[in-house]
Design a protein with these regions (language model features):
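N-terminal auxiliary segments of SAM/dcSAM-dependent transferases
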Residues: 1-9, 15-26, 30-145
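SAM-dependent Rossmann-like transferase core, predominantly class I methyltransferases
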Residues: 107-182, 186-196, 345-347
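Conserved SAM/SAH cofactor-binding pocket of Class I
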Residues: 165-249, 255, 259
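Mobile active-site "lid"/loop adjacent to the S-adenosyl-L-methionine
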Residues: 212, 251-276
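A short glycine-rich, Lys/Arg-flanked "PGG" loop and its adjoining helix->strand segment in the class I
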Residues: 273-287
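Short alpha-helix
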Residues: 276-277, 302-318
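Conserved beta-strand signature within the Rossmann-like core of class I S-adenosyl-L-methionine
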Residues: 288-295
Length: 360
């Protein structure tokens, strides 16, 4: 076969061989073949390909006899990982104009250019499941997303954490007057927290993110909202240079290893990012400055973090809680009784901690 560019979100190496399949392939045969390690290059009808993915997903084991929330959580992650690995072996080919060569296929060229730029070779091969995710993301990016308290819409990019959970956003609306404050936003994502703070009176925001896609997304959103003059964003590990009156961070809240790029918004192995944020916070604050940490307690409810762990970290880093405000987590899964983690998620709360350095 001709050389192709392999695109995968989970750093899987390019397949050594692709096996051509078509509409005659049954889901049972497909499952056997992908479990054998084959990558199946689909040619035929787009809707049939989507139906095959759905049928494969339904054939995967989801049963769990977990006895604790943590066992349920780990079983759910393993099942998701297995589903991802299995379904990612159904792949499709795009030509040098990012045309999907299946009958009844939608136009995917814009969605592909938004994520990858121009084609690098004659053919691009991508898991169909990932391409469907990119199409959905392109639609969100086109339509935009309304956020409570924000004037204007957020247009999220593919691979950047979607601000569909409103609990942490609504906590920010509790903040007192921000007039004239210089703000750092660490791990900005779409930029949503920065824009809320600017619309509430902050004079400037310097935002950072470790992912280039988030930086591009936040920059474009600032432009759309007319906030480019007061908003700067750059790729950085944690803090921008200098000091700020207010440093805000909504870090990943589950201390487990991320499995792919998108996971990094939720999973923080051994709480490394959270610990480094708290350790570096005092030095990033101007005199009289405050840190704002927004964190869910799901890790405690799952047994991944002991009760009181966060307070110990504050003390270790020379920080004290000036005030805090909590709210019940509001997201689609909190009410889903079929979710194996329902017990934990229904009790989840998100807290905004206002932190100041302990007086020397």
């Amino acid at each position: 076969g001709a050389p192709f560019t392999w695109r995968s979100e989970s750093d899987e190496p390019s397949p050594a061989r692709l096996h051509a399949v078509n509409d005659r392939l049954s889901a049972d045969t497909a499952l056997k073949r992908v479990r054998n390690g084959e990558f199946l290059l689909y040619s035929g009808d787009f809707h049939n390909a989507k139906q095959l993915l759905g049928a494969l997903g339904r054939r995967l084991e989801r049963a769990s006899n977990a006895r604790t929330p943590l066992e349920a959580f780990r079983a759910e992650r393993r099942a998701r990982q297995l589903e991802h690995e299995t379904l990612s072996r159904i792949v499709v080919s795009l030509d040098r104009d990012y045309r999907l060569t299946l009958t009844r296929a939608p136009d995917v060229a814009l969605a592909c250019r938004q994520v990858w730029g121009e084609p690098e070779t004659e053919f691009t091969v991508v898991p169909l499941k990932q391409l469907l995710g990119m199409l959905g993301a392109a639609e969100w990016r086109r339509k935009g997303l309304a956020v409570p308290g924000l004037t204007g819409l957020i247009h999220p990019h593919y691979g950047v954490y979607l601000p569909t959970r409103t609990d942490y956003i609504e906590l920010l609306l509790w903040l007192p007057e921000l007039k004239g404050q210089r703000v750092f936003d660490v791990g900005t994502g779409t930029g949503v927290l920065s824009f809320l703070l600017l619309q509430r009176g902050a004079s400037s925001v310097q935002a950072t993110d470790c992912d280039a896609r988030a930086v591009a997304c936040a920059r474009e959103n600032a432009e759309r909202l007319g906030l480019r003059k007061s908003f700067q964003v750059g790729e950085a590990d944690l803090f921008p240079e200098g000091k700020a009156d207010l440093v805000v961070c909504n870090p990943p809240w589950i201390p487990e290893p991320p499995k792919n790029r998108v996971d990094r918004a939720v999973f923080d192995q051994d709480s490394q990012l959270l610990k480094r944020f708290l350790e570096g916070l005092p030095a990033a604050l101007a005199p009289g400055g405050e840190g704002l940490l927004i964190l869910s307690d799901l890790a405690v409810l799952l047994g991944l973090r002991p009760q009181g762990w966060l307070q110990e970290q504050f003390t270790r880093c020379g920080l004290t809680v000036k005030w805090s405000k909590s709210t019940a987590a509001r997201h689609s899964k909190a009410k889903d009784t079929s979710d194996p983690l329902h017990m934990a998620r229904s009790r989840e709360t998100t807290t905004l901690y206002c932190l100041t350095p302990v007086a020397a």
